[in-house]
């Protein structure tokens, strides 16, 4: 019996057959559209399934990776050994008054739409971020002068020892693209956001404005993971990359976007290696020309 069959046996009592995929192509599950296969991909739709899955993985020493919408991830060409737990089906959103509680697989744009429907303001910035709630809380995602830390009330997380705990906003220790969840290797289960009442017309106007701005300034027509690099203190990554003469620079099928140099795109059937080589080249050039270190915002996982 091969390893994948062993995995299927371990999880067969917990999942329907349709929730278990063997040798799933990760290129079909991440926005970059690259990456080799994972041994087993599971799509839980309940908290109990998530908790039990992680428990089984730990008890059997199976490596696992929790994936939201795959919007800020780069999977290497040889794929992932072990289990990927994809939370796209764990996506309920419930509004109570001025608060919205969302499961970690819920898309940010859907939470933003729910807020708009109830004339709640504060989440407009997230209307076009392609990520999920779990990933956004994990890295304190943000855009256009807004970020998760401005609106989150608390998050329900799973700690390394398998306990479900609730962390307040302060306990989440949200900073620029970082959090206590990231530092402690916790897993987001749900997040609760708190908003202010606003005027629906103004909220709609802001959402429309930001949507147009994204379409105008970001290379949405190509697969990417959004902003490739974190913002270096005192600088903008895109400006440094452009000033380094790297606009439209291509390596293999990967390219620095001519529309926004902060984005590395899959321009023409790129491999993960193409993208990683380009990331490294950009880092070296910016360091050489300006003495500034660029650090990837995208999470890189898998085997070479």
Swiss-Prot record:
Name of the gene: murB
Main location: cytoplasm
Protein keywords: Cell cycle, Cell division, Cell shape, Cell wall biogenesis/degradation, Cytoplasm, FAD, Flavoprotein, NADP, Oxidoreductase, Peptidoglycan synthesis
Cofactors that this protein relies on: FAD
UniProt keyword annotation of Cytoplasm present: yes
GO BP terms: cell division; cell wall organization; peptidoglycan biosynthetic process; regulation of cell shape
Catalytic activity: UDP-N-acetyl-alpha-D-muramate + NADP(+) = UDP-N-acetyl-3-O-(1-carboxyvinyl)-alpha-D-glucosamine + NADPH + H(+)
Active-site annotation: 177, 227, 297
Lineage, highest ranks first: Bacteria, Bacillati, Bacillota, Clostridia, Eubacteriales
EC number of the protein: 1.3.1.98
Protein name: UDP-N-acetylenolpyruvoylglucosamine reductase
Pathway(s) the chain acts in: Cell wall biogenesis; peptidoglycan biosynthesis
InterPro entries: FAD-bd_PCMH, FAD-bd_PCMH-like_sf, FAD-bd_PCMH_sub1, FAD-bd_PCMH_sub2, MurB, MurB_C, MurB_C_sf, Oxid_FAD_bind_N
Compartment(s) where it occurs, according to its Swiss-Prot or TrEMBL record: Cytoplasm
Domain FAD-binding PCMH-type positions: 33-198
Function (record text): Cell wall formation.
Presence of keyword Flavoprotein: yes
MF-aspect GO terms: FAD binding; UDP-N-acetylmuramate dehydrogenase activity
Family matches, as SUPFAM superfamilies: FAD-binding/transporter-associated domain-like (SSF56176), Uridine diphospho-N-Acetylenolpyruvylglucosamine reductase, MurB, C-terminal domain (SSF56194)
